[in-house]
Amino acid sequence: GIEAGKTLWLGLELVHQPEWHTYWRNPGDAGVGISLNWTLPAGAKLGAMRWPVPEKLVVAGLMNHVFNGDHALLLPVAIPKDLAPGTRLPIRAEAQWLACTDKICVPERGTLALDLTVGDGAVTPADRARFDAWRAKLALPLGGQALFQRDGTRMRIAVPLPASVSATDPWFFAETEDAIAYAAPQKAERVGDRSIVETEARGSEADRLTGVL
């Protein structure tokens, strides 16, 4: 059930057939991430969608940011506080996404529908475990702000990462489009409580760079 005045979390699970993949919010050199056009009840407000950490897939020299297996996108919805128990809340979305193998791509679309009822906000143990498993695949927020510097065709990114946290072959997935060359090699080194990633810059100089390490 859902509770008036609280935040409801929606989970959109994408189930993949073997050898098929879909794309992250920044798909990389090719592909398209999922798009959702929502219709929500009056007064409800949708927050930013939370994505799992993607995987790298290089095809014909092009870097793709993909999901090779089943995964879920999480979306917070603020529910109006003046709703009486028993109020019905219809949630609808028109979805479009691209599903690919290493040989073909198929544009997909679908209509999503969910009818909820305002109640006491109780969550079943099974649903809680399911959402906990999905949240475990999200990127964790940094303890501080990352820094970046562009020098000609090179980009250096300093990501806060405590020395006590191990990192094997880290890779920076840029959310900001056209800031780095996605398929270019990345060199990473630890300097104190930071992981320094150096790679090839691309496009015009950006004043903001976001991503996932």
Over which residues does each language-model region extend?
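Extracellular/lumen-exposed scaffold segments
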Residues: 1-213
